[in-house]
């Protein structure tokens, strides 16, 4: 019996070490937007549950971040900057590289073949940054305020948040090939197989009501589905893939979308205050939910696993808005 207990104890310790090793084999980056006009945006870096670095005062409102190979790219919206950092197991190498976008108001990005395509509200375009030279080589003009952007490798798909369309842009020719009507206020977009999912958020003419919806484009047939949710349902605009299924923020958590674009309430992950859930995202097997009560730091990010269990809690700066992961084995 003693030998059996000892064997079980050794197995438990071994499994526990493997679990710790798995969680420690990646770095997690949390971008805190900061306060408008204050230039207090920051990036917190975690290894497992431990914060190993915080880069403060990056600029005025970090809009989005993305890991590409051993680089972290950040778009700083109201400073009109792209920040590029090399990543090591110790965190971000400082001071990094800074590229001006010439007052463009950068928003969201996608990377294709070592080129960064990013949307811009002020200049109403998609600019193209060469990630070898950090030189903005070209731009693609659009009509309105482009927001979410994804790519299938041959085309860019861009959400026009100020209107009601998705633009399909040929990467090679840099020309808009098709425009899809998807309903008011397209925001974030995500590709799931041959389907393009679109979250929508827009306001009444007097700005007193917020409306939410989801749309979907079959990228092969071009067929569009549009779903408008009932008044009173609070969705938010964030979309993500969890276990290869598309989720969106919904009433203090994230819930999967059904084929008819309705929300699967029963499968919701997270149950936070509706007014406090500021952002949500998923990378690998981590599901992030960033909360704020007053848009001032410190704020809190709750990290869930794919079963919905809260595994980590991060204390970060004001308004956590985006997330990225880098595998140390890279």
Features from the language model and the residues they span:
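Repeated scaffold domains used in trafficking and secretory/extracellular systems
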Residues: 59-69, 104-113, 144-153, 184-193, ...
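Intrinsically disordered, low-complexity segments enriched in Gly and acidic/Ser/Thr residues
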Residues: 228-297
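Bacterial Sec-dependent N-terminal signal peptides
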Residues: 2-33
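Conserved beta-strand positions in repeat-built beta-propeller and related beta-rich domains
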Residues: 26, 30-38, 74-79, 118-122, ...
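Structural motif
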Residues: 37-44, 81-85, 125-127, 165-167, ...
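Blade-loop segments of beta-propeller domains
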Residues: 53-110
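Short loop/turn segments that connect beta-strands within beta-propeller blades
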Residues: 47-49, 86-91, 130-134, 170-174, ...
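Beta-propeller fold detector
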Residues: 52-58, 93-100, 137-141, 177-182, ...
């Amino acid at each position: 019996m003693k030998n059996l207990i000892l064997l079980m104890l050794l197995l438990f310790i071994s499994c526990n070490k493997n679990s710790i090793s798995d969680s420690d084999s990646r770095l997690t980056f949390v971008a805190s937007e900061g306060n408008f006009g204050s230039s207090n945006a920051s990036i917190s870096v975690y290894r497992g549950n431990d914060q190993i670095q915080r880069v403060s005062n990056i600029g005025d409102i970090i809009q989005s971040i993305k890991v590409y190979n051993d680089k972290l790219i950040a778009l700083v919206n109201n400073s009109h900057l792209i920040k590029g950092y090399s990543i090591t197991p110790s965190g971000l190498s400082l001071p990094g590289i800074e590229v001006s976008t010439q007052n463009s108001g950068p928003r969201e990005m996608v990377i294709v073949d070592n080129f960064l395509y990013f949307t811009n509200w002020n200049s109403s375009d998609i600019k193209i940054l060469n990630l070898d030279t950090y030189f903005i080589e070209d731009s693609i003009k659009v009509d309105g305020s482009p927001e979410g952007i994804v790519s299938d490798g041959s085309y860019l798909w861009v959400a026009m948040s100020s209107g009601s369309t998705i633009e399909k842009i040929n990467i090679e020719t840099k020309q808009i090939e098709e425009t899809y009507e998807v309903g008011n206020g397209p925001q974030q977009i995500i590709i799931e197989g041959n389907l393009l999912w679109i979250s929508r958020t827009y306001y009444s003419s007097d700005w007193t009501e917020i409306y939410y919806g989801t749309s979907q484009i079959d990228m092969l047939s071009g067929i569009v589905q549009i779903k408008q949710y009932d008044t009173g349902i609070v969705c938010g605009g964030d979309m993500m893939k969890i276990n290869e299924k598309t989720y969106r923020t919904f009433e203090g958590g994230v819930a999967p979308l059904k084929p008819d674009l309705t929300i699967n309430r029963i499968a919701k992950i997270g149950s936070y205050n509706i007014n406090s859930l500021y952002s949500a995202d998923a990378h690998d097997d981590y599901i992030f939910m960033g909360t704020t009560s007053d848009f001032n730091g410190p704020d809190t990010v709750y990290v869930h696993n794919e079963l919905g269990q809260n595994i980590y809690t991060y204390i970060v700066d004001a308004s956590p808005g985006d997330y990225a992961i880098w595998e140390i084995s890279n």
